Amino acid sequence: MADARSLHRPLGFGVAAIVLLLDQISKWAIMGPVALRERGLIEITGFFDLRWVENYGVSMGFLIAGSDRERWLLVAGTALIAAGIVAWIWREKAKGDVVALGLVLGGAIGNIADRTRLGYVADFLDPHIGDWHPFLVFNVADAAITIGVLILVLRALLVREPKVPAENVDAV
């Protein structure tokens, strides 16, 4: 009989693939047919716009890559993190954690693809309240990473896995 890990792995990697696909399709649309790069800003509503931002750093402008060397260091660092997440998905038994890790992995790969192909990460989602912008401009990959990390934190704080009785634990 398969264990929980082998049953949940396809789910985690499937979530990652869906996030990557949605991220790259949205960026293709924004840079292609929508032509946001040329337009700069498209006002949608009083609380949401499309705004073109070339992000040369990571979250909140941290670790700005000012040179090609720094850019490739960011790519390598993100790839190492993604490899760690793959290993975590491979070992993880909890379905909720596997889904959250899939969100993070798909987002990380989406941003790696941008940084490799474009030299920056394309951000364009701009929620706001009037003139107040409580969030930085972000993309689908960033949203998936944030949601995945929040799920992991909430599950770590709130979810208690049932304990296995000692007689059911395999001897080493």
Curated annotation (Swiss-Prot):
Its main location: membrane. It comes from Rhizorhabdus wittichii (strain DSM 6014 / CCUG 31198 / JCM 15750 / NBRC 105917 / EY 4224 / RW1). The active site is at D123, D142. Disulfide bonds: none annotated. It catalyses: Release of signal peptides from bacterial membrane prolipoproteins. Hydrolyzes -Xaa-Yaa-Zaa-|-(S,diacylglyceryl)Cys-, in which Xaa is hydrophobic (preferably Leu), and Yaa (Ala or Ser) and Zaa (Gly or Ala) have small, neutral side chains. The gene is lspA. Belongs to the peptidase A8 family. InterPro entries: Peptidase_A8. This is Lipoprotein signal peptidase. The keyword Membrane applies. It comes from the Bacteria. The chain crosses the membrane at residues 70-90, 94-114, 134-154. One of its GO terms (molecular function) is aspartic-type endopeptidase activity.
